[in-house]
Amino acid sequence: ALTACSGGGTGETDSLTPEERTQRFVTAITDARSEEDNEYNSILSSADDDPADMTFQLLGVTAEDMESFAISVSLMNVKAYGLAVIKPAQDSEDTVNEGLQGFIDQQQQNFQMYLPDQYEVAKNARLETLEDGTVVMVMCEDQDTVFDSIIDSLQAG
């Protein structure tokens, strides 16, 4: 039998287990960041991790909304910072997108008045859904470079 593969090389991600996909997401974020960011902004990839509940609340999602995820956000309100690579659970695409957009909107409001540089970072955040349904949010300095690096990493596998 012949299987058609859409999405220019992203088809193989469909054969990954959620755990393998999660690891790929973590690697994509790690490789896209500076050593300093990797040191200070841990990556949440399991609902069992300590800051999971607080992080999910901040992003407007639950563990049930996500099949696989790697998330790194600043829980302190001094920096507009958030990276998320999420494979939504079936029928949760809208919930994930709306939650992440809500996070971006909230960050913009938080920084608009008192930290103009962080407001710019929040304003330039990127939120996109890839062909395979994976949702990518990038809010950090130099967001386009980080975003492109994450995408390249995910597609290279």
Task: Name every feature range the model reports, one short phrase each.
Residues 2-6:
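C-terminal motif of bacterial Sec signal peptides marking the signal peptidase cleavage site
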Residues 12-34:
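Post-signal peptide N-terminal segment of mature Sec-exported envelope proteins
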Residues 22-26, 83, 93, 97-101, ...:
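Extracytoplasmic/secreted envelope proteins and their assembly/folding machinery
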Residues 26-56:
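Post-signal-peptide N-terminal segment of Sec-exported extracytoplasmic proteins
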Residues 44-79, 95-96:
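Short, compositionally biased low-complexity segments enriched in polar/charged residues
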Residues 75, 85, 118-156:
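A short, solvent-exposed beta-edge/loop patch
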Residues 80-90:
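A short acidic-to-branched-hydrophobic micro-motif
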Residues 93-131:
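Short Gly/Thr-rich strand-loop-strand
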